[in-house]
């Protein structure tokens, strides 16, 4: 498949559709939802009706069957306006429905995916713990097998889990320790745990700096029993599932970074052409014009890197190195554009009613979530031959 720099008609239509939705449905509500730290049930359901749930899942399971670039463009367009709504869709697709589709057996796919592709429900990915972020081997959540009842018993907790504690949450994929490997490291496995399961407690977290209108939960598992067939993939496959899921998730975070950067650039260009000092628009001052030129250049570079990673993935080639580079670069370009945009807005950039202020806060998470910038540099260094 040749690498193309132009969008086909289907992709153009998708971009226009999501952009229109973001501008007309999300933008008018974004400030209020952020201020109230409110997860919007109605907006989430509308995004489901638009076809943004189950984007990469084939139609036989109720999904849209999009290629990966189309999904990434949809996330990008949402993030251009509001990081919170983009986070809901990105986490649900790459961390929720994605692992179910890629690693689930037929029974699991048919049981869960149809409702997760329509906006009826959300699914979360329980990986991070209070003492286990970048170091997944430090996990404490464990699962022991009760051979008599043919059930796994899960105990532990997870934290900062997107989409895990709201009215639409249907379940969580939980990574837990199921034994020890020959080398002494923890053996990790994944389990599908519906939210109504006895012993599961989900608490919505508040007081966030960013993504205040997305749902983030703290999860507790107290002798949670799930049947043997609730295991996702094979026993001991948890680390592989986690790593491959995060490879895909890095593209989602990169898309959010690219979208945020584009949104910040658009807002700043508009403001710079309207705001006057010394008798002319500030965009005519070299100090501002050159800043905008630098922002635009970095956005262009970020877009090309991310789209190349998507092309590699959907053409069946190794994409993991470029995914890590894209996540790293797009998140840092987002921070740069939000910061420079806020600086250009001056005092107005510090006021919450101006979207650039929200972009500035939202950008902070992108350098941390799904692998910090430091971890991305470590991953990249290994790919390029640093031993």
Residues of each region from the PLM?
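A short, Trp-centered hydrophobic/proline-enriched beta-strand micro-motif
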Residues: 119-127
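Short, conserved phosphate-binding/catalytic loop or strand-edge motifs used
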Residues: 91-97
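Flexible, small-/acidic-enriched active-site or ligand-binding loops
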Residues: 138-140, 196-227
């Amino acid at each position: 498949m040749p690498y193309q720099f132009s969008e086909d008609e289907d992709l153009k239509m998708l971009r226009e559709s999501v952009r229109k939705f973001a501008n007309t449905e999300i933008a008018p509500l974004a400030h209020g939802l952020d201020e109230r730290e409110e997860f919007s049930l109605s907006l989430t359901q509308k995004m489901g009706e638009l076809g943004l749930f189950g984007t990469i899942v084939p139609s036989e399971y109720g999904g849209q069957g999009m290629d990966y670039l189309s999904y990434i463009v949809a996330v990008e367009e949402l993030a251009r306006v509001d990081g919170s709504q983009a986070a809901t869709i990105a986490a649900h697709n790459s961390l929720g429905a994605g692992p179910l589709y890629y690693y689930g057996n037929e029974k699991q796919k048919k049981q869960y995916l149809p409702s997760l592709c329509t906006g009826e429900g959300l699914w979360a990915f329980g990986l991070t713990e209070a003492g286990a972020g970048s170091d997944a081997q430090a996990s404490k959540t464990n699962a022991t097998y009760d051979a008599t009842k043919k059930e796994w018993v899960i105990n532990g907790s997870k934290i900062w889990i997107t989409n895990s504690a709201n009215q639409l949450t249907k379940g969580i994929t939980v990574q837990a320790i199921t034994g020890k490997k020959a080398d002494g490291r923890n053996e990790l496995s994944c389990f599908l745990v519906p939210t109504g399961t006895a012993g599961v407690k989900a608490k919505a977290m508040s007081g966030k700096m960013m993504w205040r209108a997305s749902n983030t939960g703290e999860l507790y598992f107290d002798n949670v029993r799930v049947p043997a067939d609730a295991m996702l993939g094979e026993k001991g496959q948890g680390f592989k599932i986690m790593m491959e899921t995060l490879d895909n998730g890095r593209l989602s975070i990169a898309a959010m970074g690219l979208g945020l950067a584009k949104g910040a650039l658009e807002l700043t260009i508009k403001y710079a052409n309207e705001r006057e000092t010394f008798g002319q628009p500030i965009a005519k001052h070299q100090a501002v014009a050159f800043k905008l030129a630098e922002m635009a250049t970095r956005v262009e570079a970020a877009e090309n890197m991310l789209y190349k990673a998507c092309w590699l993935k959907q053409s069946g080639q190794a994409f993991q190195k470029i995914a890590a580079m894209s996540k790293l670069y797009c998140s840092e370009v987002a921070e740069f554009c939000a910061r420079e945009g806020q600086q250009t807005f001056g005092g107005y950039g510090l006021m919450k009613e101006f979207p650039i202020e929200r972009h500035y806060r939202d950008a902070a998470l992108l350098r941390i979530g799904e692998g910090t910038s430091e971890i991305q540099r470590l991953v990249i260094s290994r790919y390029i031959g640093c031993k």
